[in-house]
Structures are given as structure tokens and as C-alpha cells.
Swiss-Prot record:
Residues 185-459 are annotated as: Disordered. CDD domains: RRM_snRNP70. It is found in: Nucleus. It comes from the Eukaryota. Mediates the splicing of pre-mRNA by binding to the stem loop I region of U1-snRNA. This is U1 small nuclear ribonucleoprotein 70 kDa. Residues 211-241, 263-408 have a biased composition (Basic and acidic residues). It comes from Dictyostelium discoideum (Social amoeba). The lineage of its organism: Eukaryota, Amoebozoa, Evosea, Eumycetozoa, Dictyostelia.
Length: 459
């Protein structure tokens, strides 16, 4: 407390002592007495009447009672008026009811002349009766009766005028049912066909037209029939023990669906298997391409020995076409500038030996090689890769032909590879055979327009 600031010490100061008050004076009230003297005033309990329980109406019950009373009074009034109503004795009605139409929902701005103008397009009008308000004769009640001279005009107006707009309001056209249909009651007596004042917002009709209201009523009837049919089916299922049968049926359906799913799974496995086969074939093609490159890289000595044997066969004169190929290969290694033309000529010789079975692939490969000679061995390998990827029987046929050529006398690309890789070791062969190679005739070199190369398109 000693260390507190002055403003906080004030809060701990003692309060002032309470003021002194004198003691209250003594009371002069009478003492408490018993009730014995007052028993004669109370009645005897045995002589009391039993309690009568009375029901007090609340606000909702009062409103319901008032509404029912009003409905009953209105029904009594309608029943009395309906007994006195006779449509045939009305002097203001039209003549022939079968030529008369009933028009309702007319705008209060519409006049009788406007109605005659609008309905006069269907045919000549005999009479038009626009019903007036009994309280105010200057205004009409919104409906009228129109009689045509011919019945066909009435039918045309009945079909075409329903839903027509007059003064920005759609009207409803119907036949006169008071004198045509037996036991018909008009709207003022609790009858009629309209649903605009049937009840609440969810019940009242909010659209115009006779056909639309009829279709809506038919839809409601169909919905009710569907609900009744559903209830009938549920009762039959409960009576016949449909729960267990439904369970069995559901199990059967589920098993059937599972079987179909299994079939789809089998088809999916077959599809995946086909894709796997295609991937295996693509892997084999890639391995074959690598094997060809390894063969070209590692078998240079064997190719060189084969070239030597081919040159020996040339001197003996017993190898035929392969000796010509050997001489052309040696000439190719001797003259680099003529390598592209020699390759194309050698390709044509190969096609001639094979009977031109693979004319399309060979011609494409020769044209690609002729245009890409300067790119070296890489373009040759890419051409072979593209040819391998074409797939099908043509690809397998070309692979078999290429294998036989490599086994017999080497491929064209191998000759290129040997030329670039082993050129220093074979330089003396070029010098020995250079003169003999240039002395050989080249009958196809004059055909520089590729007239001997053809394919399926005729190019």
C-alpha cells in the first residue's frame, strides 16, 4: 500500500460510518384471533352444485365457424337461384345455340363495335350480346355471346379465335353450354369450366386459352392415375411378399451386370494385349535397328573381306550381277562425286534382281537417298527407320529382302559405312581399280529424269 500512487490509494480508504437512526415506535395492532366465528358465513360443501366445464373458442375456431356459416348461406342462396334459372326463357339470349359462341375474359376497355370488327373476319354476325353489369349498366361484365349466320363460321371462330389478343388481353372462346349441355350450371351458380378462381395461387389457372386448360386438366388426371397405379403395385408387392422377390431380382440384376462388366473387362484385356503386341513389335523393330547398326559397326572386317572376294570373283568372271555390284562399289569408293548416282543405279540393279517386288518402297528410298547423300550415314539410317515404321506385310517383306542382301553381298548403307570408316586401308584398291571402273559402260546414267523409277501413283 505504501508504494501505490495517490490516485490508487484513494480507492482503499475506509468508508464513513453509517448515520445514527432512532428505534421505531411500538405498534398498536390488535392480536390475532381464530376463524371459528366466521364459519356460519360459508356454505355447506355437500350442498354445492357440480362444476360445469365450458369450452372457450379461440381465434382460429371463430374464423372457421364464420367461414362455414358463410358457405352454407351462399349454398342456400345458389340452390334457390338455380331452381329459378331457366336459360331457354331468357329474352336477351341468342336464337340458335349451335351457331353461338361464348367469349370471356374480355378487357373492360373493349367495346361492342371492337368485338364485331374482330369476329367479323370469320363470317357474318347475326347478333352480339355483351352482358352488362346490373349495378352499372354503362359497364359490361367481361363476357359476351356472339351468334353467326352459319354454323361453319361459328366452328372456325371456335377453333381459331381462342387465345386471340384484343386490347392487350387474351380471350377464351367456347361454345354456349347453357342450352346445349344438360344439367349445366354457369359460374355464378357454382359451375363453369374456368380455374382462375378455384382457390389459392397454386391451384388457380395463370394462363389463357381453352385448349391449354383442358390439357392441364388431362395432365392432372394422368398424374392421379399414375399415383393410384403406384399405390396398387405397392399393395400387391406387400401382399405377395414382394420384398424377398425384389431382393432376388436385384441380386440377379447385379450379377448380370457384373457378367457384362466382366465381358467388357475381357475385351479391355484383349485390347491391352493388342497394344502390348504392337509395343513388342515396336521394341523388336528398335532392337533390329540397333542390331543393324552394331552389325555395320562391328562387321567392317567381314564386309571388307567380302568385297575382296567379290573383286576376286570379278577377275574370274563367274559372279554375274554380284560382280557388277562389286565393281560399282569399288568405283563408288574411288569417285566420291559420283556416289549419289552410283547408289541410285545400284538400287535399280537391286530392284531388277529382286523382280521389282518392292517398287514403291525402293523408289521412295532411292529418291530419299539421292536427295540426302550429303548428310551421310545418319540420313540413310533414318530412311531405313521410317521404312521399318510403315508396318504391315510390306515392312516385313522389305526386312526379309534386306536380310538376304546383307547375307549375300552387304547392303548399300553398309557400303557407305565401310567407305567412310575404312577409307585409308582401302585407298590402294581405289588406285588399282579406278581405270577399270571408268571403262565400264553405264547404260542407265543417261536417264537423269528418273524415267525408270515408278510407283503405284505413276510418278
Amino acid at each position: 500500500m505504501a508504494f501505490l500512487p495517490p490516485n490508487l490509494k484513494i480507492m482503499f480508504n475506509p468508508r464513513h460510518p453509517p448515520p445514527f437512526l432512532p428505534p421505531p415506535p411500538p405498534s398498536n395492532l390488535p392480536p390475532y384471533t381464530g376463524l371459528r366465528d366466521y364459519l356460519s358465513i360459508f356454505t355447506d360443501p355437500s350442498n354445492e352444485e357440480p362444476f360445469k366445464k365450458e369450452h372457450i373458442e379461440n381465434l382460429e375456431e371463430k374464423r372457421e365457424k364464420k367461414r362455414k356459416l358463410k358457405i352454407s348461406e351462399n349454398d342456400e342462396r345458389i340452390s334457390k337461384s338455380l331452381k329459378a334459372w331457366d336459360p331457354y326463357s331468357n329474352s336477351e339470349t341468342t336464337g340458335d345455340p349451335y351457331k353461338t359462341i361464348f367469349v370471356s375474359r374480355i378487357s373492360y376497355k373493349t367495346t361492342q363495335q371492337k368485338l364485331e370488327f374482330e369476329f367479323g373476319q370469320f363470317g357474318p354476325i347475326k347478333s352480339l350480346f355483351l352482358v352488362k353489369d346490373s349495378n352499372n349498366p354503362e359497364k359490361h361484365t367481361g363476357y359476351a355471346f356472339i351468334e353467326f349466320e352459319r354454323e361453319r363460321d361459328m366452328k372456325a371462330a371456335y377453333k381459331q379465335a381462342d387465345g386471340m389478343k384484343i386490347d392487350d388481353r387474351r380471350i377464351v372462346v367456347d361454345i354456349e353450354r347453357g342450352r346445349v349441355i344438360k344439367n349445366w350450371k354457369p359460374r355464378k351458380f357454382g359451375g363453369g369450366l374456368g380455374n382462375t378462381r378455384a382457390g389459392g395461387v397454386d391451384v388457380n389457372q395463370t394462363f389463357s386459352g381453352r385448349e391449354m386448360s383442358e390439357s392441364r386438366e388431362k395432365e392432372k388426371e394422368r398424374e392421379k392415375e399414375k399415383e393410384k397405379e403406384k399405390e396398387r403395385m405397392e399393395k400387391m408387392k406387400k401382399r405377395d411378399g414382394g420384398l424377398s422377390s425384389n431382393g432376388n431380382r436385384s441380386n440377379g440384376i447385379s450379377s448380370g451386370s457384373g457378367g457384362s462388366g466382366g465381358d467388357r473387362g475381357d475385351r479391355g484385356d484383349r485390347d491391352r494385349g493388342d497394344r502390348g503386341d504392337r509395343s513388342d513389335r515396336s521394341d523388336r523393330d528398335r532392337e533390329r535397328g540397333r542390331g543393324d547398326r552394331d552389325h555395320r559397326g562391328s562387321g567392317g572386317e567381314r564386309e571388307r573381306e567380302r568385297d575382296q572376294r567379290d573383286r576376286g570373283g570379278d577377275r574370274g568372271g563367274d559372279r554375274g550381277d554380284r560382280s557388277d555390284r562389286g565393281r560399282s562399289d569399288r568405283g563408288d569408293r574411288g569417285d566420291r562425286s559420283d556416289r549419289g548416282r552410283d547408289d541410285r543405279e545400284r538400287g535399280r540393279d537391286d530392284r531388277g534382281d529382286r523382280g521389282r517386288d518392292d517398287r514403291r518402297g525402293g523408289s521412295d528410298r532411292d529418291r530419299d537417298r539421292g536427295s540426302r547423300d550429303d548428310r551421310g550415314d545418319r540420313d540413310d539410317r533414318s530412311d531405313r527407320g521410317r521404312d521399318d515404321r510403315r508396318g504391315g506385310s510390306d515392312r516385313d517383306h522389305r526386312i526379309d529382302e534386306r536380310r538376304r542382301d546383307q547375307r549375300d553381298y552387304g547392303s548399300i548403307s553398309d557400303a557407305h559405312f565401310d567407305h567412310f570408316q575404312y577409307q585409308p586401308q582401302q585407298h590402294h584398291h581405289h588406285q588399282q581399280n579406278h581405270q577399270s571402273h571408268h571403262n565400264q559402260p553405264h547404260p542407265e546414267r543417261v536417264n537423269r529424269d528418273y524415267s525408270m523409277i515408278s510407283n503405284e501413283n505413276g510418278f
